[in-house]
Curated annotation (Swiss-Prot):
Belongs to the ubiquitin-conjugating enzyme family. Induction: By aggregated low-density lipoprotein. Keywords: Acetylation, ATP-binding, Cytoplasm, Isopeptide bond, Nucleotide-binding, Phosphoprotein, Transferase, Ubl conjugation, Ubl conjugation pathway. This is Ubiquitin-conjugating enzyme E2 K. The modification N6-acetyllysine is found at residue 14. It is an enzyme of class 2 (transferase). It comes from Homo sapiens. The gene is UBE2K. The active site is at residue 92. Accepts ubiquitin from the E1 complex and catalyzes its covalent attachment to other proteins. In vitro, in the presence or in the absence of BRCA1-BARD1 E3 ubiquitin-protein ligase complex, catalyzes the synthesis of 'Lys-48'-linked polyubiquitin chains. Does not transfer ubiquitin directly to but elongates monoubiquitinated substrate protein. Mediates the selective degradation of short-lived and abnormal proteins, such as the endoplasmic reticulum-associated degradation (ERAD) of misfolded lumenal proteins. Ubiquitinates huntingtin. Residues 160-200 form the UBA domain.
Length: 200
């Protein structure tokens, strides 16, 4: 990796470690390799959102051209959010694309992602199914996002009604993750979710 990128990432890595947000357990970053080309980030689900109480792991890859080009970031932890793919963890956020500026830092990225969890942009979605639910049925979206936060990010327990539907389909022999995705994308309708599971 180019020397300028390494020096910059080392400095930013230390900045995150010393930050007030890290001391409050809001953001975190760890090295994956000694070259500073791959990092593991973590953000806490913001208060008063369906993600509250969850911890979200992020894969952060630093390009050779950093800081002139943004890091490549994706969610490792599964999440139900209009701007994050429920399948791949890919993120739709302008600062990770054309609005990136060389003055931005790892800390900026982590805090921006945390802010995105609190303020979704459903009209610029990464996941159309989630965005549609967010706009058409906000209460169901919140319950679904909360359930995903519980199952995948360790947030406190969520909707007993949704949990029962998951258990019933799992008892039929379907894979738990596949069941959660099918029910979530089919508005928690057991019949259409079952049809989807049988067609895969």
């Amino acid at each position: 990796m180019a020397n300028i990128a390494v020096q910059r990432i080392k400095r930013e890595f230390k900045e995150v470690l010393k930050s007030e947000e890290t001391s409050k357990n809001q953001i975190k970053v760890d090295l994956v390799d000694e070259n500073f080309t791959e990092l593991r980030g973590e953000i806490a689900g913001p208060p008063d959102t369906p993600y509250e109480g969850g911890r979200y792991q992020l894969e952060i890859k630093i390009p050779e051209t950093y800081p002139f080009n943004p890091p490549k970031v994706r969610f490792i932890t599964k999440i139900w959010h209009p701007n994050i793919s429920s399948v791949t963890g890919a993120i739709c956020l302008d600062i990770l694309k054309d609005q990136w500026a060389a003055a931005m830092t790892l800390r900026t990225v982590l805090l921006s992602l945390q802010a995105l969890l609190a303020a979704a942009e459903p009209d610029d979605p990464q996941d159309a199914v989630v965005a549609n639910q967010y706009k058409q049925n906000p209460e169901m979206f919140k319950q679904t996002a909360r359930l995903w936060a519980h199952v995948y990010a360790g947030a406190p327990v969520s909707s007993p009604e949704y949990t029962k539907k998951i258990e019933n389909l799992c008892a039929m022999g379907f894979d738990r993750n596949a069941v959660i995705v099918a029910l979530s994308s089919k508005s928690w309708d057991v019949e259409t979710a079952t049809e989807l599971l049988l067609s895969n």
